[in-house]
Every structure is written in structure tokens, then in C-alpha cells.
A protein has these predicted regions:
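Active-site-adjacent loop/helix surface patches within enzyme catalytic domains
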Residues: 2-113
């Protein structure tokens, strides 16, 4: 297991500092990219990301962890709109409760075997 720190470019997070005590939720997503790694994702978000998306941490199958955004910053990870199928999928239970501002985002890498 290795730990990396590779801070994402400004597109991925808010530069305004937040207090860690304001964090109430942990959001876990998966990248859906077969074979990707924590380090590769952190490298991409540090140099190649042009969209307003990001995550605080990436974790891969080997157990490697890459920190991409400091915990006192807000990652653009949760989104702002409900998906159209939220009633069927059971999603949106935390819509407007869990936000970018009050959550830490973790992306799981290569977990779609």
C-alpha cells in the first residue's frame, strides 16, 4: 500500500477554505475505468482535468491511496441536480442535505470486474 499526494488543479475544487468540523458526510463513488489506479487518477486531476469535477481521495485495488484535494477545500464531486430516475433507483435521499460543501469524496478505482 502506498500513499500519494498530488493536488488537483483549480478546476476540481473551491479555493475557499472550509472548516473540517463542517464535514458531515463521506461520499463514495467509483471511476468505472477498468484497470485505472489511484495514482493515475490523481495525476490526471493535477494536470489534465478541464471539467469542474474532483475527489479528495482515490483508492485502488492494491490499497494505494492518492490524496487529490486537501480536506479543508470543497471538491466538486456531489453534483447539484437530481437524476431523472431517482424514484426508481432509490437515489436522492440526501439531495440538498449532502453537498460538496459538507462532504469528503472518495473515488474507488478499477472496481467494476
Amino acid at each position: 500500500m502506498k500513499m500519494y499526494t498530488r493536488i488537483a488543479n483549480q478546476n476540481s475544487y473551491s479555493y475557499i477554505k472550509r472548516k473540517r468540523k463542517d464535514v458531515k458526510y463521506i461520499v463514495i463513488h467509483f471511476t468505472a475505468n477498468k484497470g485505472d489506479t489511484a495514482k493515475n487518477n490523481a495525476d490526471y486531476f493535477a494536470t489534465g482535468n478541464t471539467r469542474q469535477v474532483g475527489a479528495h481521495f482515490f483508492v485502488d485495488k492494491k490499497g494505494d491511496i492518492a490524496r487529490s484535494i486537501r480536506l479543508n477545500r470543497t471538491a466538486w464531486a456531489v453534483g447539484g441536480e437530481r437524476y431523472g430516475d431517482y424514484k426508481e433507483s432509490g437515489g436522492a435521499k440526501y439531495f440538498r442535505k449532502c453537498t460538496n460543501e459538507n462532504s469528503v469524496s472518495i473515488e474507488l478505482c478499477d472496481c467494476n470486474d
